């Protein structure tokens, strides 16, 4: 099964190398460039999150899970993909299209790492959306029900579940498209439903009748914190949607015909957007949270020897 999975991927690359070589070259450069960017950004964000004293504990753990998976996507996934693509481009430039040495190990390992880490990133964002929903829905009971141990257990289970899903994915090469489509649509629906509810509640809070304002005065600081956290998570979700929704659409196209060159190309483009998500998430953290932004700036100054 693993050999079949690898051969299918290799066939796709053979098609793109013959028909869309400049696009593959662009992918190679972009993947290697954003691999470095994602690695550096997420290292800085992980340090900032660990040093933060104002970010809610549960949210910090969730952001750490997301940042670590995004770091690994850049450091391992994108860099491996960029290097393998560069090898294929160099060999075929000399007229050598014998790329069988890449299977069954190299391509399988590369895509297994990518699928595993993007799966963790995908579900971490969904978990953040659900957590922001619980903050508003449970309010005062949130810390009683959503404890630190439960968050750690949930995310440990998430990482293990993504490992199992990756194994299943590589073992079902003929059904992998449907498998990924089901996972993506379920995740997109859960995250979208959560944020629709979150912002319907926030809108009602911002339009409270004047005579009721004094009743909420004592909770205003907590409410503002909740709104800021929800807004930050919502920006993560918007980027997430822009990066993952095109991939779902391309998967739907491939279900109709896996041999159409334009569909294969579109799927690789949407795959790059999925990887790009790991470079965009850290920017959102730094932009929305003043303390994290300050810690990142100080870290950069130290690295660049700027006083």
Whereabouts are the PLM-identified features?
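Extracellular N-terminal segment of 7TM GPCRs
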Residues: 1-44, 85, 90, 306
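Intrinsically disordered regulatory tails of 7TM GPCRs
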Residues: 1-15, 54, 203-225, 290-307
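Extracellular TM2-ECL1-early TM3 structural module of rhodopsin-like
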Residues: 20-32, 59-127
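Hydrophobic alpha-helical segments of membrane proteins
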Residues: 43, 75, 79, 229-253, ...
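Intracellular effector-coupling site of seven-transmembrane GPCRs
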Residues: 69, 200-247
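Class A GPCR helix-loop hinge within the 7TM core
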Residues: 116-154
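Extracellular-loop-to-transmembrane junctions of the mid-late helices
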Residues: 161-200
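Seventh transmembrane helix
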Residues: 190-191, 242, 249-252, 268-307
């Amino acid at each position: 099964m693993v050999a079949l999975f690898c051969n299918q991927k290799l066939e796709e690359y053979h098609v793109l190398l013959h028909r869309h070589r400049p696009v593959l070259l662009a992918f190679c450069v972009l993947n290697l460039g954003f691999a470095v960017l994602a690695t550096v950004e997420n290292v800085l964000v992980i340090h900032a999150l660990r040093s933060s004293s104002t970010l809610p504990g549960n949210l910090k753990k969730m952001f750490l899970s997301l940042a670590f998976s995004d770091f690994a996507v850049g450091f391992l996934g994108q860099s491996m993909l960029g290097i393998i693509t560069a090898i294929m481009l160099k060999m075929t430039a000399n007229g050598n299209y014998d790329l069988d040495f890449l299977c069954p190990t190299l391509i399988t390992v590369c895509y297994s790492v990518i699928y595993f880490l993007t799966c963790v990133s995908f579900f971490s964002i969904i978990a953040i959306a659900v957590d922001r929903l619980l903050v508003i829905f449970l309010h005062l009971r949130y810390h009683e029900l959503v404890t630190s141990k439960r968050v750690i257990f949930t995310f440990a289970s998430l990482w293990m579940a993504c490992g199992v899903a990756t194994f299943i994915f590589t073992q079902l090469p003929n059904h992998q498209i449907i498998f990924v489509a089901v996972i993506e649509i379920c995740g997109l629906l859960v995250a979208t439903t959560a944020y629709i509810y979150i912002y319907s509640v926030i809108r009602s809070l911002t339009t409270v009748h004047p005579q009721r304002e004094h009743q909420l005065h004592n909770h205003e600081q907590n409410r503002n914190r909740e709104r800021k956290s929800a807004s930050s998570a919502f920006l993560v979700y918007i980027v997430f949607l822009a990066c993952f929704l095109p991939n779902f659409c391309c998967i739907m196209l491939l279900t109709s015909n896996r041999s159409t060159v334009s569909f294969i190309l579109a799927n690789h483009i949407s795959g790059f957007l999925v990887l790009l998500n790991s470079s965009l998430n850290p920017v959102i953290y730094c932009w929305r949270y003043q303390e994290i932004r300050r810690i990142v700036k100080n870290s950069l100054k130290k690295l660049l020897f700027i006083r």
